[in-house]
Amino acid sequence: MDEEIKHEIRKMALQNAFEHGGQTQDKIILGKILGTKPEFRTKVKEISGEISEIVASVNQLSPEEQQKEMEEKFPEALAPKEKIEEREGLPELKDAIQGKVVTRFPPEPNGYPHIGHAKAAIINSEYAKMYGGKFILRMDDTNPEAERMEYHAAIKVGLEWLGIEFDQVKSTSDDMEVFYEKGIELINSGKAYVCTCKREDISQNRRERKACKCSMEDVGKNNKNWEKMQNKFKPGEAIVRFRGDMKADNAVMRDPVLLRIIDEKHYTVGDKYRIWPSYDFAVAIEDSIDGVTHAFRSKEFELRKELIDAILDALGMRKPQQGFFSRLEFKGMPISKRIIKPLIEEGKVSWYDDPRLPTLEALRRRGIKPEAIRKFIMSLGLTKANTLAPFDALEAFNRKFVDADSMRLFMVKNAKKLKIKNLQSTIVEVPNHPINDLGKRKIEITEDFYISGDDSEAIKEQSTIRLLGLGNVKITKIGNELEGEFERDGDSSNILKIQWVPQKTAHEIKMIIPKILFNDEEFNEDSLEELDVYTEPQYLQLKEGEEIQFVRFGYCRKDSQNQAIFTHK
């Protein structure tokens, strides 16, 4: 192979490893080289072997050695990259006036917030910022059967964690008297009527595009039935329907429900009301009276635009501009309460903060930064194309935020004992980060160490290995335990470099490794791996929730004194 290509591969491998905690992967470098040298796409087999050898060689180097080689051979790879101003994907708004744009985020408090809620909140928030406008948080709390204060609180906590700020906070239920007033106005104008048909008859008539007898009643009869809805009719016996078009191709327009009876106690207003607006009626009225100029929601609501406009036209009220975007989901990570709730009830998932889920609580617990979520969502832009993203797309953004501030610690899994003779000291000082000044830590050592079982399998008798931050060790015996002798000032090139933990002060923790929850439509029984591992006593000094990188393993978040959660490589 051309020496120039080998040179380029090594530079890419060193740079990528250096930027990602000292490790890189064959497939990453293969992708990079094929991107810069497309002529090699017909020679993938030929170059793959060379890439594997170079990657293996680079991964054996410590971060300090990687940096040194780049400084000597590839200084351009360490040079600061010219910052390119990126436009983050939000197109300009139609009919937008600087300082006059009003957007809103109207979550229903019927579940824990997830990545889809984050997308809606961030898009609406960013548009308000873009135009120096106003952003409203409006809890869409008009279904007492499904809504709870715990969900209301969880949404506010999640939005606060995301760093989203609002100019106004309200609840849709604040305006119940307005909905009653507008409902009566529609009835009196003949644009709405009270329907007492059975639910199954209503559904059949809508399918067959036929009007029912209730739609023929006069205003007087409808007003009497409205009064009966206050205290006589039971839930399901009467509803207020909008007089749309029963022949319409858009089924949403076939005389939809505006108001219905729900005899459940509301979590804030109690039992003051029993007639509650439908989503379409509530959002139409609220957006108009709140002064919303641009209303964005996910595209499954797109067919409802016609209805919302029709309701506001019937009432002579101002209409906002309406925009739509695709739902955001991750492959194999459901956001639907219909799927998540049974998993919790069956014990397959622990709670809504289970790190395998895409809820905001779960993402926070897993170690995903809110800044990464925002950057990721903004990178998607305002598209209506389906967004079923792989989770590693978010991981790539998160890595940029956690790397600089994540303390490096040693951790070993499947621990194997190693006894070392002739050590020169009882304390070793190790930097907390290979590049950034995060200080140093002192590790007390004796002759007894733990190393990872995976590493021990690659060690041969009479070979020399390097314990990172400590020095070279010549292995003199291999068995249930390994033995070796410390070599002062040994050459570190082309030898295995591994992390370690002193047996005397080793702290045992449980490592939780979340994996994809569903393969296609099937629950993955192996979606959560648990490992018993040893780490340094320094782990106990970390704050709960602190992000760290276990050397040669990956980024993790401290969940408790005795447990860590794997974030990503």
Curated annotation (Swiss-Prot):
The UniProt record lists the keyword Protein biosynthesis: yes
GO cellular component: cytosol; protein-containing complex
'HIGH' region, short sequence motif: residues: 107-117
UniProt enzyme class: ligase
Primary location: cytoplasm
InterPro entries: aa-tRNA-synth_I_CS (IPR001412), Gln/Glu-tRNA_Ligase (IPR050132), Glu-tRNA-synth_arc/euk (IPR004526), Glu/Gln-tRNA-synth (IPR000924), Glu/Gln-tRNA-synth_Ib_cat-dom (IPR020058), Glu/Gln-tRNA-synth_Ib_codon-bd (IPR020059), Rbsml_bL25/Gln-tRNA_synth_N (IPR020056), Ribosomal_bL25/Gln-tRNA_synth (IPR011035)
EC number(s) reported in the record: 6.1.1.17
Biological process per Gene Ontology, one example term: glutamyl-tRNA aminoacylation
Catalytic reaction equation(s): tRNA(Glu) + L-glutamate + ATP = L-glutamyl-tRNA(Glu) + AMP + diphosphate
Subcellular location: Cytoplasm
UniProt entry tagged with the keyword Protein biosynthesis: yes
A Pfam family recorded for this sequence: tRNA-synt_1c_C2
Molecular functions per Gene Ontology: ATP binding; glutamate-tRNA ligase activity
Keyword annotations: Aminoacyl-tRNA synthetase, ATP-binding, Cytoplasm, Ligase, Nucleotide-binding, Protein biosynthesis
Described purpose of this protein according to its UniProt entry: Catalyzes the attachment of glutamate to tRNA(Glu) in a two-step reaction: glutamate is first activated by ATP to form Glu-AMP and then transferred to the acceptor end of tRNA(Glu).
Family designation: Belongs to the class-I aminoacyl-tRNA synthetase family. Glutamate--tRNA ligase type 2 subfamily.
Classification via NCBIfam families: gltX_arch, PRK04156.1
Protein name, per record: Glutamate--tRNA ligase
Organism: Nitrosopumilus maritimus (strain SCM1)
Gene this protein is translated from: gltX
